[in-house]
Amino acid sequence: MPEPHPAPQPYTVAALYQFRALPDPAALRAELLALGERLELCGTLIVADEGINGTVAGSAAAIAELHAFLLASGFDRLEYKESQASEKPFKRYKVRLKKEIVTLGVPVAPREQVGTYLDPQAWNDLLADPEVIVVDTRNRYEVKAGTFQGAVDPEIDSFREFPAWVDEHLAGAEGKKIAMFCTGGIRCEKSTSLLLQKGFQDVYHLKGGILKYLEDVPQAQSRWDGECFVFDGRVTVGHGLQEGDAVMCHSCGWPLTAQERAHPQFEEGVSCEHCFDETTDVQKAAFRERQRMYEAGHLT
């Protein structure tokens, strides 16, 4: 009898960042590019003068080797989280050289001045205080998939819009407690630094972000509603970092629930109720052809 095929191994997904002054980001980029290609990684790493940020995936052994390389390269305070994906979550591997590892667009000093970190239990305690202003720093399409109970949604389309939102909506709240959160914690390093720079006193953020919270907090004790949007093929994850139920609209990028996929304006790869009126018939025809080629195996 033929030997049974071994079960496919899940991909290990590593989300990581650290703010750290880098003397030669271009040299680090070259090393990471060569290492990732040898290890057959997929995903994106961003390198800048201020540090490193990214999400990558590969075999457990490959991710362990990448992690060891980063530690040996001086990233000794790396914010690092692993989860699993049943299918390849990214199409290719990229290492980008940028001005910022997460783009706020205004100068802040997250290596010198950030808010108070809270672990998940302390975060739950803070959320129970009705006087606390809880702010979701993510983009609107991320918030749509899920958020913390009682959180304010700034309804921004880019993190670059956050400073202007603060000036417009938090002016006069400098004496209040402000608690902020994001997917993995990196945006809150900059958002809390921004608020402290503007004179706010009591500024807090969730250490490790939503992903760490969902990993550590049982659903029965959770103040999280919905799923968490992630920037890979899983689209969303839930408690225990299990893959979620959402599917991305490849026209507009919104995460869609089963109910939204049952809407008459949903067509896989072409449109959903959020973008149906935003594209022309010519564009929809092009999307339809792209989807046909994808299903035929001509696109990946």
UniProtKB/Swiss-Prot annotation:
What domain of life does the UniProt record list for this protein's source?
Bacteria
SUPFAM superfamilies, alphabetically? Rhodanese/Cell cycle control phosphatase
Gene3D superfamilies recorded = 3.30.70.100, Rhodanese-like domain
Single GO molecular-function term?
oxidoreductase activity, acting on paired donors, with incorporation or reduction of molecular oxygen
Matching InterPro entries: Rhodanese-like_dom, Rhodanese-like_dom_sf, TrhO, TRHO_N
PROSITE patterns cross-referenced by the UniProt entry? RHODANESE_3
Q: Which reaction does it catalyse?
A: uridine(34) in tRNA + AH2 + O2 = 5-hydroxyuridine(34) in tRNA + A + H2O
Which GO biological process categories is it annotated with?
A: tRNA modification
Q: Which Pfam families match?
A: Rhodanese, UPF0176_N
Annotated signal sequence range: none
User: Which keywords does this chain's UniProt record carry?
Assistant: Oxidoreductase, tRNA processing
Residues in Rhodanese domain copies: 128-222
What is this enzyme's EC?
Answer: 1.14.-.-
Enzymatic class = oxidoreductase
Instruction: Report what the protein is called.
Output: tRNA uridine(34) hydroxylase
Species per Swiss-Prot/TrEMBL record: Deinococcus radiodurans (strain ATCC 13939 / DSM 20539 / JCM 16871 / CCUG 27074 / LMG 4051 / NBRC 15346 / NCIMB 9279 / VKM B-1422 / R1)
Q: Which gene encodes it?
A: trhO
